């Protein structure tokens, strides 16, 4: 077998050269990549590899799992079973032979050392036991000698002690005799004194009885206390006093004091005497020195000497009652503290964090401020974003007045036919497209030009780098052109002006420059900063120059973005697709958006299930300045919301729910504020007519635009009220809502489903479909105009001059007049003018010509006029006859 190089052997074995060199090194052979390998070395390597393959596993892991059930008692006598699973894991590691020999040697040495230590310990214990026995023997000998000496001393003292005892006994007997004699004398004296007291008491009692019999008056003698029963009577008095005290306490607590106090009196005499006997027995047992402890039913509660300082956690807003509960005080105390600080509040009033902090610190508590958006900040900060920024494509928004050729211009650039697909030839959605040019990529946003789409244009200006302002050369600056300029200036975005329709004969580019200069858009040739490009979307003139101008402006801006890391962007448009669910058009600003990423988007969250570009093709990722449609959100996000990729779906859901709750709180607070501010305006609310509308559209941007346009139509007499709005088709719920609120169902580029149509037919609802916003607004205007009350207008139909005044018994003063203008008609309202000043306004009661009643008198004829309830008519006055006509008003 011939020698081969190591590289050839590596290629033959299909392993890397470095791996093969390492295997040779493990087998004990040093080789480099260019060395040759002999047959013997191959055999050595093969044997080494076989040994490695045959060797068993170095590590063995055993797992054991046990399950048990634990019963936990719960409330209401019910118990709950909890499943407990215990997992144990043990790993055995196989050692190599050399390691095993080394460990065995160490264990043997350790055993020998332990044996040696044990023998030494036994010898030490023997020595200590021998020494202890010797010490005990010596101590025993000492004790025996001491006891012997003690016995000898006791025998010597025994004789002398006996003599002393005899003398003590004699003295004690003499003392006892004297004490007995003294006790006998004392007893006799006490008996004599008691006898004298009894005789005196009997004498006094007989004297009192004799005097009572003499006066024939019976009296109850005062009881004489027996000194022998002193303790018994004392205990009885004490118990009576305690019973009286207890009755007062119990009577004060209960509703009926008399009933409570009378309750112990109902007890029998046996129970009372038993208690008295027990008290007396206890008192007698105590003797003179014994004291019975006083008992009382009153429970004493003392107020804490010092206030308890607590840690009070305060959120961004808190009510006065909640703050009082956290501090464990009454709400009135918190209100008093706020009044001292100069703030008036009720117990249910919501106060801000700063005010609550001042009040809590004033009352001596420690305050812990809690930010409610702490979780949101933590989620947003826990993101991977790359550090290196790279150049990115510019995002260009095309703005301008309606029908000035914005979409057609973009259409020519993209070589597609978008304008023909839009209803009415006007753009009603934001179209996001990116196109490749020879000099780089450009992302275009096409915004609507109609006045109703103000929010869409503002959103486009916020998400863009450069604004291309399209102005028709034959039309000049129009209202939406001015609005687009204002949006661009507010966003601080440079403007490139595209003067379109330059191929028309009536085109006047200089007029466009002059008009734009009035709004601060000056061309470069006039010393300004804006580039002006003459284009024709129809003929394709100047398109390349426009793209070059855009790329030049982008180069000046030095647009950069981070490509690596988690993506972030903005929602350009969103809608609800019946088959795919919520769909959002997202413009990525930085990072890379991948399929499967977890995104947080305003009030919604979800995982990106699919991504499509503007051509409807599936893509797996999208970098900066790339618009894509994403699927998988929990709901339809609002256009303009920030899109952020996060790590944890659970936390994203919590943040989305927090945002929804916060939005609801702000909305309710705003409604409450408006109710308070418009209190007087709402007093006449019943006189205002309302047009209720349930609006459904295909995309979120259209819902916003139509809602804003309709709400702006409201007047003091007729108001438009959007009862409900949303994205998607008209459902049965929408129809039911419209029936309940007497509303008009409006569908913009959507249709009603079968169940909704049944409800609409049964309830006879007004359902209208639209595809052009002009028609929708015009019809709502017409409906509102029908609700307006007509305008009353006074029209002068005749004027007569008073030439003479006659008296009539029936009508009073009659004015003889000459009709100078128009026609005088009977029963019409009139005004009497004197020196061109109205002095009376009333009704024409009588109109005669030659004593005949007539209905009207024409110009140039004489007549007699009687004014109802007015007699102060003079010569030279003018009588003006007018009529009131109704004029139907319309919404402008």
From Swiss-Prot:
Start and end residues of each stretch annotated as Disordered: 88-306
Domain of life: Bacteria
Region entry G3, spans: 446-449
Annotated segments matching region G4: 500-503
All copies of domain tr-type G, residue ranges: 391-560
Family: Belongs to the TRAFAC class translation factor GTPase superfamily. Classic translation factor GTPase family. IF-2 subfamily.
Protein name: Translation initiation factor IF-2
Native organism taxonomy: Bacteria, Pseudomonadati, Pseudomonadota, Gammaproteobacteria, Enterobacterales
Gene name tied to this protein: infB
